[in-house]
Swiss-Prot record:
Family annotation (HAMAP family): UPF0102
Pfam families, per database record: UPF0102
Similarity comment text for this entry: Belongs to the UPF0102 family.
Descriptive protein name: UPF0102 protein RHA1_ro06551
GO molecular function, one term: nucleic acid binding
Organism: Rhodococcus jostii (strain RHA1)
Disulfide bonds: none
SUPFAM superfamilies: Restriction endonuclease-like
Coiled coil: none
InterPro entries named among the record's database cross-references: Restrct_endonuc-II-like (IPR011335), tRNA_endonuc-like_dom_sf (IPR011856), UPF0102_YraN-like (IPR003509)
Top-level division of the source organism's lineage: Bacteria
Length: 118
């Protein structure tokens, strides 16, 4: 379990750096409520982006992006509503992205950013 938590935290760090280098601003990380946790919340222009990060070392359990099930999507939407209410800020546009990371297949991690994933 600790190994999975460390892998997940490493993946979130990689994703945050990747998104920042792509011009996004990280607004919040690991925001929690009774519904669970949002990995990253970022701003890109007038978009507020809720980002689910999935990190894998292999494809034994499927690709990282495939791990974002309908149930997980629904939970992230609930979290987004709570975050928006609690933040007190208004965003004209909101979207949900997935950053899928494969580690251990070559010298560099493979990062796939799926915009507006759900």
């Amino acid at each position: 379990m600790a190994h999975n938590l460390a892998l997940g935290a490493h993946g979130e760090d990689l994703a945050a750096r990747y998104l920042t280098e792509a011009g996004m601003e990280i607004v919040d990380r690991n925001w929690r409520s009774r519904y669970g946790e949002v990995d990253l919340i970022a701003a890109e222009g007038d978009w507020l982006v809720f980002v689910e990060v999935k990190t894998r070392r292999g494809l034994g359990y499927g690709s990282p992006a495939e791990a974002v099930t309908f149930s997980k999507q629904r939970r992230i939407r609930l979290l987004a509503v709570e975050w928006l209410r609690d933040s007190g800020r208004h965003w004209s546009r909101v979207r949900f992205d997935v950053v899928a990371i494969m580690i251990g297949h070559g010298p560099q991690p493979q990062i796939e950013h799926v915009r507006d994933a759900f």
